[in-house]
Amino acid sequence: MEPRRAAPGVPGWGSREAAGSASAAELVYHLAGALGTELQDLARRFGPEAAAGLVPLVVRALELLEQAAVGPAPDSLQVSAQPAEQELRRLREENERLRRELRAGPQEERALLRQLKEVTDRQRDELRAHNRDLRQRGQETEALQEQLQRLLLVNAELRHKLAAMQTQLRAAQDRERERQQPGEAATPQAKERARGQAGRPGHQHGQEPEWATAGAGAPGNPEDPAEAAQQLGRPSEAGQCRFSREEFEQILQERNELKAKVFLLKEELAYFQRELLTDHRVPGLLLEAMKVAVRKQRKKIKAKMLGTPEEAESSEDEAGPWILLSDDKGDHPPPPESKIQSFFGLWYRGKAESSEDETSSPAPSKLGGEEEAQPQSPAPDPPCSALHEHLCLGASAAPEA
């Protein structure tokens, strides 16, 4: 058997590859020589048919490697480079133009955005300052309103005291004038007046005239202004009225104003109480505590305004109403029936029928009692008109006092 020969050029290829000085084309040629030697050895040993299918593929691969290593011709490279340079030049010009547009556009937008931001910040600061001013003015307004309410209350109290003092002063002047007059010069009218005052129960030693008590109770007097004016027009007959017409009209005007204020305060109190009762978040214990506090405060205010000692609490006061609202239980729907009671319908149905019989049975007797008590009840007050509503309120409040 013939010894295997080394492929020519293989040691040189290794040395060139190690040295790194061979070109790509030379490497392809050395590779082709080595592969050809190996294929010839295979054909000599095993026959030409052993490498017949492999040779065309190896040759095609080596040709492609040669074309890739050598590259195209210089003329073809120049022809393909010219349009590429033109396209590159055009793209550079377009790039410069786009850069200029991009550089000019954002500057204007940034300037506009900067101005808008400054305006927005300034408006936000102004709005915050306005909100602070409005909040401060609102607090000042509330404080002024509270002061005004206190001043109005003090003014009304001072007016009431002034009217009482004027009444007492006039009464003292009249008593002093009567005391200075000689006893034999007393007129028959003065004697009759002294006799009537001495016989009237509840008068203080018969010295204070009747017009003094009437003037002190002017805010709660239920008389009509026309009747008061008629009484004013006859000062010589009674010898008791010492007020002028202007003073009496001023007193009536103050009384009407006070009644109007009391009516408005009652309406406002009823509204707040209605809101409080309809609020389901308020517990019942708090409502009871508020009930006791309102009742005590009402007694204190009443005793202070009337100048009487504070009354002790009684069982009737505790059971009495503490609000100005009417009973509106009929407005609320009945609670829904429990589903558990439906399983025991026989027992609950019997209880419901018995309760209905109990509620329906005393109705005739109750109606009869009302009919019997109706003739004994006093005659109802006449209806109040829009002009005399405050007078009617005073008339209804006088019997209670």
Curated annotation (Swiss-Prot):
GO terms for biological process: cilium assembly; early endosome to late endosome transport; endosome to lysosome transport; endosome transport via multivesicular body sorting pathway; intralumenal vesicle formation; negative regulation of protein catabolic process; positive regulation of protein catabolic process; protein transport. Residues 310-319 have a biased composition (Acidic residues). GO terms for molecular function: dynein light intermediate chain binding; protein dimerization activity; small GTPase binding. It is found in: Late endosome membrane; Lysosome membrane; Cytoplasmic vesicle, Phagosome membrane. Keywords: Coiled coil, Cytoplasmic vesicle, Endosome, Lysosome, Membrane, Phosphoprotein, Protein transport, Transport. Homodimer. Interacts with RAB7A. Interacts with RAB34. Identified in a complex with MREG and DCTN1; interacts directly with MREG. Interacts with CLN3. Interacts with FLCN; the interaction is direct and promotes association between RILP and RAB34. Rab effector playing a role in late endocytic transport to degradative compartments. Involved in the regulation of lysosomal morphology and distribution. Induces recruitment of dynein-dynactin motor complexes to Rab7A-containing late endosome and lysosome compartments. Promotes centripetal migration of phagosomes and the fusion of phagosomes with the late endosomes and lysosomes. This is Rab-interacting lysosomal protein.
